[in-house]
Each structure stands twice: as C-alpha cells, then as structure tokens.
Amino acid sequence: WGACEFCRRGEPTLCVDYHVLGEHVPGVHAEQIAVPEDNLLPVPEGVDWSTAAAAPLVFQTAWRMLIERGDLSAGESVLVLGASGGVGHAAVQIAAHAGCEVFATAGTAEKRAYAAEIGADHTIDYTEDDFARAVRAETGGRGVDVVVDHVGADTWDDSLRALARGGRVLTCGATTGGRPQTNLDRIFWNQLQVIGSTMAAPGTAERA
C-alpha cells in the first residue's frame, strides 16, 4: 500500500490514490496478469474458480459494510434492498448469520423465494408494495435498525422512512444515481446515521 495516513493505518480504501483493478486499471480480462501480492487471495480447497472469482468482491464488500462499518449486532433488524443481486444476496446471508431479523426486497416471486432460502425472514415485492410502509407494518410501526441501500436515488428517501429512530442506513453504491433528494428533517429529528463503505480493507477476507 501507499504511505498516506490511511494506508499507514490499514485503510487503503480511504486513500486519495485508491484504484480498483478492472475499474480504474485495465487488463483484468486477460488470461494472465501480474498484480501485487497484496491483491491476491488463496483459493480454499473445494472452491471452484467461478465461485472464487465472484465471491470475494460481493462478500468482502457486504462484510465490511455491515460488520466493520455498520457495527451490526445480533438481535437487530435489517432491511436489504436488491436482495437477489451480488452485494444484496451477500448482505442477506451475513445479516442472517449475525443473528439479525432480515427483511429483503426483490422484484419477482422467484427472487423473493431465493432471498428466503438464503436467510431472509420477510420478503417484500418492491414492484407492488411501498417497502418502507411494508417494513413499518411488519414492525408495529417501529421500522428497522439498519437499511442496506446500494440502489441510490430511486430508493433513498424510502430507505430513511423505513428506519427506526436512531437507525442507520449503509450504502456502498448508487445504481440509480448518486444525487438523491434527502429529507434532512428526518435524519436529524430521528437521529439517523448515514454510513458509507467502499470495497474492503486488508484482512477483511480472513475475518469474514
């Protein structure tokens, strides 16, 4: 890693010169590529190459966001948007494994069934239902402790509406746009936390 204050304390994703292989640095579709050793992980015995190529990105991203940045605890309630996507399905599994009550949104019956299969306690069809209202109905009007929103502008205000007082929204992406309108009254009056997370830090894979 580099020599900035963030790299020195083991947080290279905060470095101003942080780059992602395949996004900022081309060439990762080549059959062979030379990269720094720190960018590599050993493939565990019994894990096929397709799984090894796909799992680290989404599971490390979700783990850092939920556990390391979001400080998720057993017994909390978590709403995961886009639960059938890469980060979404990883977040559902991590939250369930952590002992949380998991709500998940998905757009088809098949995807909702998959979310339930991997750990969601409640599934919501976001194409038919106001997911914030559905969550509040399921929680007796309280809302959830944590919302995982990597969708962005289209869902941001509803994510804030779905939170209980003192809740926190975790974001690692903005598929539908990164400039949502935000109700600041709701954030400060309900004492909500907005927590951003990007990729993973060194050692996240081992901890996860």
Model feature map: region roles:
Residues 28, 106-114, 131, 179-184:
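Short, glycine/polar-rich helix-capping loops at beta-to-alpha or helix-loop-helix junctions
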Residues 98, 106, 154-208:
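Glycine-rich phosphate-binding loop and adjacent beta-alpha segment
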Residues 124, 145-148, 170:
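N-terminal Rossmann-like NAD(P) cofactor-binding module of classical short-chain dehydrogenase/reductase
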Residues 48-129:
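Mid-domain Rossmann-like dinucleotide-binding core that forms the NAD(H)/NADP(H) cofactor-binding site
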Residues 130-141:
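Short amphipathic alpha-helix with an adjacent loop that forms part of the alpha/beta core around
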Residues 68-73, 138-140, 161:
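Glycine-rich helix-loop-beta junction characteristic of Rossmann-like nucleotide cofactor-binding loops
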Residues 1-40:
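Glycine-rich phosphate/adenylate-binding loop and adjacent beta-alpha elements
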Residues 83, 151, 174:
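NAD(P)H cofactor-binding loop motif with strongest signal on the N-terminal glycine-rich segment
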